[in-house]
UniProtKB/Swiss-Prot annotation:
Record's GO cellular component terms: cytosolic ribosome; extracellular region; plant-type cell wall
Name of this protein: Beta-glucosidase 44
Gene name in the database record: BGLU44
Keywords recorded for this protein, A-Z: Disulfide bond, Glycoprotein, Glycosidase, Hydrolase, Metal-binding, Secreted, Signal, Zinc
Signal sequence range: 1-23
UniProt organism field: Arabidopsis thaliana (Mouse-ear cress)
Role played: Hydrolyzes p-nitrophenyl beta-D-glucoside, p-nitrophenyl beta-D-mannoside, cellobiose, 4-methylumbelliferyl-beta-D-glucoside, laminarin, amygdalin, esculin and gentiobiose.
One BP annotation, GO: carbohydrate metabolic process
């Protein structure tokens, strides 16, 4: 039997070289995955803010302790079948106790700011009146620690979570009293936290609140006409419009309080956060172009038009007629110009077309009033790759068009891109979850289009990724993961994904 000796040295050298180069190439492949596509902090103007975003109900947990009152979502999640796997947000990712760990993560990843929301019912368990000082103490701890770590707080006052007490007292957002109660709550927050918080937002996605809560009833408080959803009460033809009217007035009243009593001294600003799906005409036909414009008017225009011009879009006035509330002269003065900046939550784009055949609907409702057909493909070709959520397609050019639309149609207000991101399924393993190269591509492509819009004159001054953490994703519960940090829901341990490392690389400062 021939003796099996070591390979001769030239062969050994060859083997060593090949193993070195293959190791080097796998290292280089990993580096390529973190490649920022030419983007860096220096691609954006000095002072451009990069942050991440979450909301109180989705990340805090501790819903029943320390004096917090229930919100409409605490009641809604208890209805069997409303939330995937009947999940609740009682613990979620427990930021209430782990906020220091989360702020430390933001710092390590080179972010500048954190957009969080304050739970109205944690401050005022009954919606008004008695203050829960333990809740106030929590937000003081969170804000103080952010400031200590050099993370700028962006505080949102309302993210879907109306105090349940107000829903029971006067039907919540359907009651005119909510305008004063919200302004009182906002003023308390300015007075209490405004020495450190200089960036305030009144409402997150108020359109979603009105449409999903009162037109099809799939969100809390679950009201709609029977023709449009499984609701026990509601009126899709009128309630979404009444709710929106009250939301706009509540926003304007809160801004008025800030400008009158706090802005000069605190030197902060107040805005609102609006969701904006870009609607692209399916064809070049006049009918499809009109359908796309109708969709934009009923979507973003419903809120931004009154805030900039003091009235609802003409399209809406002509279609909704007497079902659309009107602003008084005094209200117009309060509403018009009531934004120091506007946040745009931009995730995706859809095709819009004129429905065929066009028939007069039997039942009236907000979505029905659009009279459009949604499309996610053209000539069999999808508009973009789909994320896990059925509504979310990766269409980066829609970001550019949405921002340029705001520039051209609404006087180029100061804007922050206040949410942007994509999800993976909730059941991905840790290894799969960490290797989120699709998310990196999503962020790279969308940020490239944001930069293009900025270069073409859109006044965008900040960008917030949704979300810092995997968390409670409303109807999807824990079956959808939007975070750049993976959370093990059993242990609540945080694991930064590749996308988090990508942001760390992107946001390196020159002196690092």
């Amino acid at each position: 039997m021939r003796h099996l000796s070591s390979p001769p040295w030239p062969l050994l050298l060859l083997l060593l070289l090949s193993s070195f180069t293959s190791g080097e190439s796998s290292l280089s492949a990993e580096k390529n995955k973190l490649h920022t596509g030419g983007l860096s902090r220096q691609s954006f103007p000095k002072g451009f803010v990069f942050g991440t975003a979450t909301s109180a109900y989705q990340v805090e947990g501790e819903t029943h302790q320390d004096g917090r009152g229930p919100s409409i979502w605490d009641a809604f999640v208890k209805i069997p079948g409303k939330i995937a796997k009947n999940a609740t947000a009682e613990i979620t990712v427990d930021q209430y106790h782990r906020y220091k760990e989360d702020v430390d993560l933001m710092k390590k990843l080179n972010f500048d700011a954190y957009r969080f929301s304050i739970s109205w019912s944690r401050i005022f368990p009954e919606g008004s009146g008695k203050v829960n000082w333990k809740g106030v103490a929590y937000y003081n701890r969170l804000i103080d620690y952010m400031v200590q770590k050099g993370i700028t707080p962006y505080a949102n006052l309302y993210h879907y979570d109306l105090p349940l007490a107000l829903e029971n007292k006067y039907k919540g957002l359907l009651g005119r009293q909510v305008v004063k109660d919200f302004a009182d709550y906002a003023e308390f927050c300015y007075k209490t936290f405004g020495d450190r918080v200089k960036n305030w937002m009144t409402f997150n996605e108020p359109r979603v609140v009105a449409a999903l809560g009162y037109d099809n009833g799939i969100f809390a408080p679950g009201r709609c006409s029977k023709a449009f959803g499984n609701c026990t009460e509601g009126n899709s033809a009128t309630e979404p419009y009444i709710v929106t009217h009250h939301l706009i007035l509540a926003h304007a009243a809160a801004v008025q309080r800030y400008r009158k009593y706090y802005q000069a001294k605190q030197k902060g600003r107040v805005g609102i956060l609006l969701d904006f799906v870009w609607y692209e005409p399916l064809t070049r036909s006049k009918a499809d172009n009109l359908a796309a414009q109708r969709a934009r008017d009923f979507h973003i225009g419903w809120f931004i038009h009154p805030l900039v011009y003091g009235e609802y879009p003409k399209t809406m006035q002509n279609i909704v007629k007497e079902r659309l509330p009107k602003f008084t002269e005094k209200e117009v003065k309060m509403v018009k110009g009531s934004i120091d900046f506007v946040g745009i939550n931009q995730y995706t784009t859809y095709y819009m077309s004129e429905p065929h055949p066009t028939t007069k609907p039997k039942d009236l409702g907000y979505q029905q009033d659009w009279n459009v057909e949604f499309g996610f493909a053209k000539l069999g070709k999808p508009i973009g790759p789909r994320a896990y959520s059925s509504w979310l397609y990766n269409v980066p050019w829609g970001m550019y068009k949405a921002l340029m639309y705001m520039k051209e149609r609404y006087g180029n207000p100061t804007m922050i891109l206040s949410e942007n991101g994509m999800d993976d399924p909730g059941n991905v393993t840790l290894a799969q979850g960490l290797h989120d190269t699709t998310r990196i591509k999503y962020y790279k492509d969308y940020l490239t289009n944001l930069k293009k819009a900025r270069d073409d004159g859109a006044n965008v001054v900040g960008y917030f990724a949704w979300s810092l953490l995997d968390n409670f994703e409303w109807l999807s519960g824990y079956t959808s993961r939007f975070g750049i940090v993976y959370v093990d829901y059993k242990t609540l341990k945080r694991y930064p994904k590749m996308s988090a490392q990508w942001f760390k690389q992107l946001l390196k400062r020159n002196n690092k």
